[in-house]
């Protein structure tokens, strides 16, 4: 039983590590190197908590929702306007890779579309389906 539990734990650790590496590599396409190191972490954490991720990921997310939302909005507002669509697509792709197993894509799409309103930003007109992520 202990061997089975340690194998499951190792599998989850490997999945988390590969997902974070994928996010770090693809995020660098949209942001300068100084911003790429963890730029989307508060947004990703906010979306994961809002969409009701399981308790196994909650232990890694120690920040309150209000703080994560504020940090996410500050990051989104600091981006160039032409990056918003690409960033939303990147967020959607990351979310699909990491947490999509039990959640519907409509929930994620709705959340991504509400981000500009949540941050009091002018909504950006784009189709998430054109990203190949929905």
Curated annotation (Swiss-Prot):
Residues 1-24 form the signal peptide. One of its GO terms (cellular component) is vacuole. Seed storage protein; serves as a source of nitrogen, carbon and sulfur for the young developing seedling. It comes from the Eukaryota. This is 10 kDa prolamin. Keywords: Seed storage protein, Signal, Storage protein, Vacuole. One of its GO terms (molecular function) is nutrient reservoir activity. Belongs to the prolamin family. The keyword Signal applies.
């Amino acid at each position: 039983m202990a061997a089975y539990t340690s194998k499951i734990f190792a599998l989850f650790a490997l999945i988390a590590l590969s997902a974070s590496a994928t996010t770090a590599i693809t995020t660098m396409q949209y942001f300068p190197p100084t911003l790429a190191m963890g730029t989307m972490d508060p947004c990703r954490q906010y979306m994961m908590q809002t969409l009701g991720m399981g308790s196994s990921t909650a232990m890694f997310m120690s920040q309150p929702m209000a703080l994560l939302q504020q940090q996410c909005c500050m990051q989104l507002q600091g981006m160039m306007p032409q990056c918003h669509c690409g960033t939303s697509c990147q967020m959607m792709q990351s979310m699909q890779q990491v947490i999509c197993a039990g959640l519907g894509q409509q929930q994620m799409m709705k959340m991504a579309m509400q981000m500009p309103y949540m941050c009091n930003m002018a909504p950006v007109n784009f189709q998430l389906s054109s990203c190949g992520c929905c």
